[in-house]
Amino acid sequence: MGCRKITLGSDDSVQEDYSNRNMKNHHGGVLLKGGHLYGYSDGRGWTCQNLKTGEVVWDSKKLGKGCIFYADNRLYCMDEGSGTVVLASADTKGWKEHGRFKLEPQTELRKPAGRIWTHPVVSNGVLYLRDQELLFAFDVKK
């Protein structure tokens, strides 16, 4: 498990540019911004990876494994275990946190070892988060 970058030629040829374990994403997704991938990599933590070279630009374990969303030059990252949500910069200089909070209350439907696998969504300046039957809306307009 890991990541691989391939290039498709005009003659339908395939060239492998790299294959490594720098971004081992599970279900949290990754996003591409300015030639860099952002996401959670198992064992490494939150990671910024150069798409062209495959090299890790930075990594951080300041938040547990989870999902990611991008809006207004910010990363919305949510820890799937604790429900902690972090607003961070989409920046190649490192993990820059602008705030965090814990999603509460949390569902009673989820088993104790269960996870929150829904992705954050921002629409019209409102951040939407869901945990089973619970839906949360936060005003995140500038």
Task: Label each residue range with its predicted role.
Residues 1-142:
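Noncatalytic, solvent-exposed loop/strand surfaces
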